[in-house]
Amino acid sequence: QKDSLKIRSIFFLVGNMADKYSLIPTNEQDPFHSIILNNHIKETEDARLPGKSRIGMALDSLYKSGVNAPKPQSIRDIEVVTGDFLIKNVEAAFTIWQRSKKLTKCSFDDFCEYILPYRIENEPLSDWREQAYHKYSCLLDSIDDPIELAKAVIRVSGLKYNDGMNKYPFLPTFSELDHLHWGSCKHLATY
């Protein structure tokens, strides 16, 4: 039974892969990406306010200096996702689903729609699920309520809203956000 559900999960992912892709910087030296990755910018609590984010000011200065907004490279999942990546993702998704049954009684269809996907939007492919599980699985043992679990993840993560991150032209990966501790509303929602 479980193996047949896993096989159906693989078919679900492959069947929905045609329009999935990553948008990544065209080169590793992209100045917009470098600002985020190097993160030597120290923010204050005011970063949540428009015009107060130092990251936002740094990104603005790039735009004003004539640096063209980056044209991201599109990489189609169908061309790069491997069988091993899918199997690893399905196994990890099933672990979460089985472990979190106490949180929500979701059907297999809901599992496929909300738990199984290996990406949120067009962020670079990553092992975000494994990283998140490693960091937050201990919370699954102690918190039964999904809303309280979400609040605990936010508290433990240390992530904060940063208005300037709205100007960042790429979607950060889980590990990039975990390193930054700052993100736009969209970034925080996908974290």
Model-derived features: positions:
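Secondary-structure boundary elements
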Residues: 3-26, 30-179
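Cysteine-centered nucleophilic/redox motifs
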Residues: 153, 178-191
